[in-house]
Amino acid sequence: MTDGLRWQEVFQGIDSTLLQEPKFVRNKEKLLQTFGGKTSKESREKLLPFLWNTIAPNGQIYGNRAKGNRMNVLNPYWFSYPGYNEVLTGFADDKINSNDKIWNENITFLETLNNNASFKDKVAAFATWEVIPYIINEKRTNIPVNAGLE
């Protein structure tokens, strides 16, 4: 799962609209040379090569709104912690309304899996955000979480 990416860049490559904004771009020509392409497919593969050359051929990429493939969260906040909770538990929780480091009271599918005898102590999480241990509730679940800063 990714977080903090705009669907436009994921599916269409470099955003020419943002290239016109001096507050976002220092060297437009270099960006176009490095990440541009004759097609959006070529541009997106230059911008996110691992996603398109490794993950996509072996998995599924959802959320291309230009093709009507809308993936929406149900929570009203549209930012990280509420979204991760929703994905990991299967439901939105309006009480989760910040990205603060608060132990998640909800049971995630990772915890359910870890409580299954076949998977006991075989579940772990790897992330790059220091709030993930709280979302998974590492303290309660005893699921090892490496959040990149540990």
Say what each PLM segment does:
Residues 1, 8-9, 62-65, 86-89, ...:
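Structural recognition of the beta-strand scaffold that forms the well-ordered cores
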Residues 1-60:
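Active-site-proximal N-terminal segment of extracellular/periplasmic enzymes that hydrolyze or transfer
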Residues 8-15, 66, 98-100, 135-139:
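Short, solvent-exposed loop/turn and secondary-structure capping segments
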Residues 10-11, 67-78, 123:
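Phosphate-binding glycine-rich loops and adjacent basic patches that engage nucleotide phosphates
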Residues 30-38, 69, 89-98:
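Glycine-/proline-rich flexible loop or hinge segments
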Residues 40-41, 64-67, 103-105:
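A short linear-motif detector with a strong N-terminal bias
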Residues 57-71, 117-121:
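N-terminal beta-rich core of secreted/periplasmic extracellular enzymes
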Residues 75-150:
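His/Asp/Glu-rich, glycine-adjacent segments
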